[in-house]
């Protein structure tokens, strides 16, 4: 039909395996033979993309495909709900190898690849490694292994892939799922343990904050934290006094329209200006702001979104934090109150 109506069987994506076998029908034997002569002149050993355009493979040859006739992926027990895709393996297989994550110009995806230029540090590389492990094409127990950890390690969980990948592959969520299995078999490093438990450890830092803020950028401190695996190219954050924030909070407008401002661990301890400006903006729109733990709500420590736990696969602890937040809403009767978070 395409030939009858003088159409083209290929376009911007080229010919490849799918269309090459139809060249003789479309172009005729004379032109097809000319293609072969050009190929043989410049590529005598047939090294450059063999089986495409010239002397093509059959498009339905399963031996050429990632999914062979005997392909079967393992349906493992997961901590996240992957039913939207079928299961975890099906979600991984959403990566169709289009390579959009290899771009170096616009957008954000994929930050680790933009630095290393290595396929293994790419969304596609990680997805393929996970897929090969769960379809038993890698050595036994490869899914929960140190090699898989190395593959996933440089993913910064920015979720750019979920936004910019044509298939919306969510590698940040997949990494979190992987780590939830990995840390049941292997112990966490001190560095990862400190960051993941920051919501519970921050009170220790606050006790020594006057001293910490003065010495944190000294060379001797940089040498110490480097040994634990932290990057020293950036300055360590300053632990901030919450007094200015509490002053603005107490002096804000009173209104029937109330909103909960979720003061996460990092904003309330290291970047209180974000919360201060947020209160002012919300007040301008006629909202009175409620910050959990700043009122008489009997919280032993500030509420936490569980983000650090999620990033390190500590999903049981993340669930604990989310349950604390739900309980806070229920106890105080804030069922219909809007919740604002700061990214």
Regions flagged by a language model, labelled:
Residues 2-5:
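Catalytic or ion-translocation cores adjacent to nucleophile or general acid/base/metal-coordination motifs
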Residues 139-343:
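Iron-sulfur-cluster electron-transfer modules
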């Amino acid at each position: 039909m395409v030939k009858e109506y003088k159409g083209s069987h290929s376009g911007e994506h080229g010919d490849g395996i799918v269309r090459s076998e139809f060249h003789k029908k479309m172009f005729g034997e004379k032109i097809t033979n000319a293609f072969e002569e050009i190929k043989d002149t410049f590529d005598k050993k047939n090294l450059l993309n063999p089986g495409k355009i010239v002397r093509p493979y059959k498009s339905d040859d399963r031996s050429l495909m990632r999914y062979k006739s005997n392909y079967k992926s393992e349906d493992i027990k997961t901590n996240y709900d992957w039913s939207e895709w079928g299961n975890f393996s099906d979600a991984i297989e959403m990566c169709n190898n289009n390579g959009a994550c290899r771009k170096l110009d616009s957008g954000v995806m994929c930050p680790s690849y933009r630095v290393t230029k290595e396929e293994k540090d790419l969304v596609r590389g990680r997805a393929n490694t996970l897929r090969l492990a769960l379809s038993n094409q890698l050595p036994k127990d490869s899914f929960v292994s140190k090699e898989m950890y190395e593959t996933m390690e440089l993913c910064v969980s920015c979720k750019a892939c979920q936004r910019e990948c044509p298939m919306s592959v969510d590698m940040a969520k997949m990494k979190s799922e992987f780590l939830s299995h990995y840390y049941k078999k292997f112990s966490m490093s001190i560095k990862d343990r400190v960051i993941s438990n920051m919501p519970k450890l921050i009170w220790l830092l606050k006790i020594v904050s006057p001293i910490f803020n003065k010495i944190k950028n000294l060379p001797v401190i940089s040498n110490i934290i480097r040994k634990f695996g932290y990057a020293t190219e950036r300055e360590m954050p300053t632990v901030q006094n919450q007094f200015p924030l509490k002053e603005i909070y107490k002096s804000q407008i009173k209104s029937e329209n109330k909103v909960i401002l979720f003061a996460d661990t990092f904003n309330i301890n290291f970047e209180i200006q974000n919360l201060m400006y947020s209160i002012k903006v919300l007040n301008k729109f006629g909202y009175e702001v409620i910050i959990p733990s700043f009122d008489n709500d009997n919280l032993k420590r500030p509420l936490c979104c569980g983000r650090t736990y999620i990033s390190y696969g500590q999903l049981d602890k993340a669930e604990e934090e989310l349950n604390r937040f739900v309980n806070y809403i229920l106890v105080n009767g804030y069922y219909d109150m809007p919740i604002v978070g700061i990214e």
